[in-house]
Amino acid sequence: MLNVKPRDVLDFWFAAGWEKWWKRSDAFDAEIRQRFGKTYDEAVAGKLDSWMGEPQGALALIIVLDQFSRNLFREDHRAWAQDVKALSFAREAVRRRFDVEIPVMVRNWIYMPYMHSEDLAVQEEGLGYFARLDNPEVMKSAEEHADIIRRFGRFPHRNHVLGRVSTPAEQDFLDSGGFSG
């Protein structure tokens, strides 16, 4: 898709819905790659930073960097390569109060980079934002992510992809069906 606009990203993402967001689907991943692969590359290169000029653009840019990356690069270190950049944009969006200008039902997507961080202080900061949403399901997920970071200091399910050696406690957690991310 050429000349993608923030609205294109948002319309696509929100039309997809919970089923596609949280269940692995090679077809959905392929659709993101086909429609937004170049958009992702442009975002990584900083060519879409201007989207941060308004709330909807900020939301779209964060989704591209924080969510599309996970669909584009499953089982690849690049799935998390833009997490720092996405978090930086999320923090900027919050600082500029863009989050409160976005409907509460989709606001969690601005906060997702906090949930994806392996830094406990960032996780704790994010919990405050997620608590404001008054969405028990989203809050439960945020708490689960933070608990894993409290326990291990990182997400063990990323270890094999990132070339990290799992500790015995992490391996036990993974073997017992621990969080898969």
Model-derived segments and their meaning:
Residues 1-59, 64-75, 80-181:
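Intrinsically disordered, low-complexity activation-like regions
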